[in-house]
Regions:
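RNase III-family endoribonuclease catalytic core
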Residues: 2-118
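Short active-site-adjacent structural elements
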Residues: 109-110, 137-141
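Beta-rich strand-turn-strand
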Residues: 123-126
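Pyridoxal 5′-phosphate
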Residues: 130-134
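C-terminal edge-of-domain segments
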Residues: 141-157
């Protein structure tokens, strides 16, 4: 009988001054890019943290720290694939991934299916759902200073 483990992840980044954001493993050329050591993909990073949390394998910082130049500029898709390898090495299987982008822009709806496919591909075909919300003008996402994402996962072993 399999044991089920749940994990939660969160990430937030402020916008920089250049266009070409990476969000949910897709490039959004007209959106401001998020600043960060990697590509600033808040959705991918939140999913990574949720998976690592569920497997009790630490978090992004402890596995892919900013002090290691190897991870500078790395894509969210590559981080997801690395995390997938870490959790499958411990005999975990992903049951479900659910992520939510928090911010005013870009609007995920028109590219939701494409984003789900990209995230799922990075996780070797895992079941993924993606939604988005705003904070009705409140906080740094509401004022347009950046983006955040929340993710929950279920994994089994």
């Amino acid at each position: 009988m399999s044991e089920i483990f749940s994990g939660i992840g969160f990430d937030a980044h402020k916008f920089g001054d250049k266009k070409g954001a990476w969000i949910a493993c897709l490039e959004w050329p007209e959106s401001l890019a998020c600043e960060g050591h990697s590509d600033g993909d808040v959705v991918a990073h939140a999913i990574c943290d949720a998976l690592l949390s569920a497997a009790n394998l630490g978090d992004l910082g402890s596995n892919f720290g900013t002090s290691d130049p190897k991870w500078a500029g790395v894509s969210g898709a590559n981080l997801l694939a690395e995390v997938y390898n870490l959790i499958t090495a411990e005999k975990f299987k992903i049951q479900n991934v659910s992520a939510q982008l928090i911010g005013n822009s870009p609007k995920i709806g028109p590219r939701r299916d494409e984003a789900i496919a990209a995230i799922s591909s990075a996780l070797s075909g895992a079941r993924v759902s993606l939604s988005a919300t705003t904070t009705d003008g409140m906080g740094f996402t509401g004022s347009g200073e950046g983006l955040a994402a929340l993710a929950t996962v279920l994994i089994a072993r």
